Amino acid sequence: MITETPHPSPAERQALQSRVVQALSAVVPAHALLWHAEDTTPYECDGLTAYRQRPLVVCLPETYDEVQAVLRTCHQLQVPVVARGAGTGLSGGAMPHAMGVTLSLAKFNRILEVNPESRTAVVQCGVRNLAISEAAAPYNLYYAPDPSSQIACTIGGNVAENSGGVHCLKYGLTVHNVLKVKGFTVEGEPVEFGSEALDTPG
């Protein structure tokens, strides 16, 4: 479902933008913030290009501490945050908020571990879907959920959208292939879901 975002006056938008940029500048480097129109235009929509909205600010953190600090700061300012992976989705899931911050997680792109014995991988949320299969290929393994955008889409976006693909007819959707997720609430509190082991049958 696409939710219509408010249309603030230019003065309201500029005033809030200045407050948000000033506050976020205290928790992330200057190069991690984008707010000029020419810089934020690529973030106006995801793959559903019929709907566009320029975000107030785009933030590109590089560490988990920065993500947490950004979320806490925005929560204190009562500014909405929309997380964004590669922006390939067709559901409007990464649609920006006119008076909000787009939190780009593209820099979290490391594959931390591939374990052929347990047939598991530990990856950051910005890792491309296809990159996981490429890393597992030397062990004759692959990551089953394979959306048509797998060459570009990220695992974080796949988790958020419960992405599928042709292989899902046999191996299930993303939810059936992810054991554990670590992240933050919108208030910036750390959370974990699942575990590193499969559930015991029964």
Question: Predicted regions span which residues?
Answer:
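N-terminal flexible segment immediately upstream of the FAD-binding catalytic core
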Residues: M1-R72, G89-R119, S148, Y171
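Short, well-ordered loop/turn elements at secondary-structure boundaries
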Residues: Q76-L77, H97-A98, N177
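Residue-level detector of anion-binding/catalytic polar loops
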Residues: V79-P80, Y142
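Conserved PLP cofactor-binding pocket of PLP-dependent enzymes
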Residues: R84
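FAD-binding subdomain of flavoenzyme oxidoreductases
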Residues: R110-G202
